């Protein structure tokens, strides 16, 4: 199973990027997590651009989503919200209408912040957007609060409880992919 991990932060060595790398380390056998690093190549959503030609950064994101079995979002929180660059990427990936690269693609969300609540509002905002885009999403909310205290000096996720939560989330994502694939197969057979 191939999962595209999208880190919502543009900052180098961000907490979110470290958590995304930890998720790849914790992935169940047979699950490959590929890190997406093109968020900064996606222009602000503009329907005029969509009508002319899809920008190269958007085309790359769409192709990588379409080549994946699932998507993993790892997001920080800015002012009680998901980062604009991440929301912008979701907007582009869901367009044009009727051709969403997110529709039907299973997803899981991890939010992480140095604040105690672990960016839970950002995670909930992305979950809400995925409801609209038709993206089946794991119900488990993984919000890693005080993430700065849970990462080791080498960048690995050292906190056992956080590791267990991420591991459980990835197992549930794998189950969701199986369910979606089974439903699609049944629709084709009908």
Task: Identify the function of each model-found stretch.
Residues 1-31:
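N-terminal beta1-alpha1 ligand-phosphate binding loop
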Residues 3, 16, 20, 42, ...:
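A general structural signal for well-ordered alpha-helical segments in protein cores
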Residues 31-44, 136-145:
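Short beta-strand elements in bilobed, periplasmic/extracellular small-molecule ligand-binding domains
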Residues 38-55, 153:
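N-terminal beta-loop-helix "entrance" segment that forms/cooperates
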């Amino acid at each position: 199973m191939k999962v595209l991990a999208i880190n919502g932060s543009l900052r180098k060595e961000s907490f979110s990027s470290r958590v995304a790398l930890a998720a790849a380390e914790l992935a169940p056998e047979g699950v490959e997590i590929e890190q997406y690093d093109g968020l900064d190549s996606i222009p602000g959503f503009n329907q005029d651009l969509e009508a002319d030609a899809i920008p190269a950064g958007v085309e790359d994101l769409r192709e990588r989503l379409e080549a994946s079995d699932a998507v993993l979002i790892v997001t920080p929180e800015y002012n009680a919200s998901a980062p604009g660059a991440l929301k912008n990427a979701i907007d582009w990936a869901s367009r044009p209408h009727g051709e969403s690269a997110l529709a039907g693609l299973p997803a899981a969300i991890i939010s992480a912040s140095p604040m105690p609540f672990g960016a839970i509002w950002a995670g909930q905002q992305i979950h809400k957007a995925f409801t609209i885009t038709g993206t089946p999403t794991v119900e488990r909310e993984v919000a890693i609060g005080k993430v700065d205290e849970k990462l080791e000096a080498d960048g690995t996720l050292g906190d056992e409880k956080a590791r267990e939560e991420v591991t459980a989330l990835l197992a549930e994502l794998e189950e969701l992919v199986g369910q979606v694939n089974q439903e699609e197969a049944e629709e084709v057979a009908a």
